[in-house]
Regions:
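Membrane-interface anchor segments at the N-terminal boundary of transmembrane helices
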Residues: 81-85, 89, 323-415
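Membrane-interface alpha helices of multi-pass inner-membrane proteins
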Residues: 164-179, 207-214
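Membrane-proximal stem/loop segments at transmembrane-domain junctions that anchor or position
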Residues: 226-359
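Short acidic/glycine- and proline-prone juxtamembrane loop motifs at membrane-interface regions
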Residues: 129-139, 178
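Transmembrane-helix motifs of polytopic, lipid-linked glycan transferases
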Residues: 88-108, 142, 146, 150
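Loop-to-helix entry region of an early transmembrane alpha helix in multi-pass inner-membrane enzymes
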Residues: 67-71, 79-99, 130
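Specific aromatic-rich, kink-prone transmembrane helix
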Residues: 56, 139-157, 167-172, 188-189, ...
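Extracytoplasmic catalytic/substrate-binding loops of multi-pass membrane glycan-assembly enzymes
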Residues: 37-51, 60-72, 80-84, 304, ...
Length: 479
């Protein structure tokens, strides 16, 4: 967590930096430790319940999760049969990543910004709740943002340090492979490798290739599959949307999908179930639930190939209004946290349905669990303000705009990566889950430094821009 170039600082300054990082780490450890003690072993949710149940049955691939997350779960919960063994290392990683960024900001003498990010981002009840749960979204989102932060620092100095190499190696697998949309992080990693000199470039390549090969090999050996991906759920969910019965029964709306699409879909779900089981906010009713009535899991490769072809050649274009409305609805329902939520005390009842060595509240704390529930519920009632990802989204747009105006390639790559992530979430989400947008709640940790804390900058020459606009006074900083 500490800068790599501490030896080059004066003695008093070195002590100041050490104190800042230690204090930040201790505050975060205290906050996360108290929270986890009150929710031990952590909220399960439907995904956590499925993960534990399938690992217990030696069938983790049927969770539909990505191989990297399943490998981690097998190496922790699978070997110990304890949920806390899975959660605690992730909590420590989150504390370390947050202390790294917030401490860096404080060292640059922005105490108000650092304190605001500590209180309004790092230690908010919903972040603590997701961070201690069996969902990979919190650690994935934070790792994604923290890895972009490290890339930004390295690009500012055009060199790798021991600390930066360690951070890249630690954060990369979670940021890239814990969820399918993490693959986007390969773009800034590739850009970083190109911008660095030969030796450093090969270090980046080695980190990417070694982790990628290890996860691919582990997933193959453990027969973990490839998850359900993003395209299949989208096509099935939206095709069901397009096939909803229209009460007006207008002539113009009688052929909203191809005859072949109707034939394929009706092999696996009846029209009555298409009308009754479709939920505009969730695809769970078509996949995870009602498997006696919806047999999409049994769909043959040939049928899905034909369905995919019809979707992109006719069905999508015939239903642009319905598709756009569906995308906007799910995105806004997610951003406003109007979907399902897992409370802090979820494990109280969730553990009863699975076989595990973990127990709820093993410390027999009497008031802390109830207090945390009350804090969480109060925060939830103000979620439209306190949980809003729109601050991060606005900052992404501001940084992207400035990068275009100043033709600053480094910032353009960083902000474009987040915009691609946002576009992917908008286009491919099939459930109104707030956790999908957690990366943009974390985004101010990265974007406030980029937007407001000057870093060594080397903008591309722009003949149309005044020199004073594209050149800034550098501030000495260490990665």
């Amino acid at each position: 967590m500490m800068p790599s170039s501490l030896p080059r600082q004066g003695g008093a300054e070195r002590l100041r930096i050490i104190r800042i990082y230690l204090c930040t780490t201790l505050i975060l450890l205290l906050a996360y430790g108290i929270w986890y003690a009150g929710v031990w072993p952590g909220p399960l949710g439907q995904d956590g319940y499925s993960l534990i149940a399938n690992i217990n049955q030696s069938a983790p691939r049927y969770t539909g999760k990505d191989p990297a997350w399943l490998l981690y779960a097998l190496a922790t919960y699978g070997l110990s049969q304890r949920v806390e063994v899975l959660v605690l290392p992730l909590l420590l990683l989150q504390v370390a990543a947050l202390a790294r960024i917030i401490g860096w900001i404080y060292v640059r003498r922005y105490p108000i910004t650092a304190t605001a990010l500590l209180l309004l981002v790092a230690c908010t009840p919903h972040v603590l709740n997701y961070g201690s749960s069996l969902y990979p979204d919190a650690v994935f989102s934070l790792a994604f943002v923290a890895l972009l932060f490290e890339i930004w620092l390295i690009l500012g100095h055009r060199r790798l340090s021991t600390w930066s190499i360690a951070w890249l190696a630690i954060l990369f697998p979670a940021a890239c492979y814990f969820k399918a949309n993490g693959i986007i992080i390969l773009l800034p990693m590739l850009y970083l490798a190109i911008r660095l000199k030969t030796t450093s470039r090969w270090v980046i390549v080695a980190i990417v290739l070694s982790w990628s090969a290890a996860i691919q090999w582990g997933g193959t050996v453990a027969n973990l599959g490839h998850g359900h991906g993003a395209l299949r759920p989208l096509i099935l969910f939206e095709t069901t949307n397009f096939m909803q019965t229209r009460p007006m029964n207008l002539w113009e709306t009688r052929h909203m999908v191809t005859d072949r699409t109707k034939e394929i879909m009706h092999r696996y779900i009846s029209q009555e179930d298409i009308d009754s089981l479709y939920d505009r906010d969730y695809w769970d009713t078509l996949w995870h639930l009602n498997q006696d009535r919806v047999r999409f899991r049994e769909m043959s490769r040939i049928d899905f190939r034909h369905l995919r072809s019809d979707f992109f050649t006719y069905n999508l274009w015939r239903n642009i209004p319905a598709f756009t409305a569906s995308r906007i609805n799910i995105f806004l329902a997610s951003a406003l946290a109007q979907g399902g939520m897992v409370g802090p005390d979820n494990a109280r009842h969730g553990l009863a349905g699975v076989t595990t060595l973990s127990t709820y509240n093993p410390f027999n704390l009497s008031s802390l669990p109830n207090t945390l529930n009350e804090i969480y519920e109060t925060s939830y009632n103000w979620r439209f303000v306190l949980w809003s990802p729109f601050v991060g989204i606005i900052l992404v747009l501001l940084v992207f705009k400035r990068a275009l105006q100043e033709r600053h390639l480094d910032e353009l790559v960083i902000s474009s990566t987040l915009l691609l992530q946002l576009g992917g979430i908008f286009l491919f989400s099939i459930a109104a889950e707030y956790r999908y947008l957690l990366a943009f709640f974390y985004a101010p940790l990265l974007l406030f430094p980029i937007r407001f804390i000057q870093q060594n900058r080397d903008p591309l020459p722009c003949q149309k821009c005044p020199r004073s606009r594209s050149t800034r006074q550098p501030v000495t900083s260490t990665p």
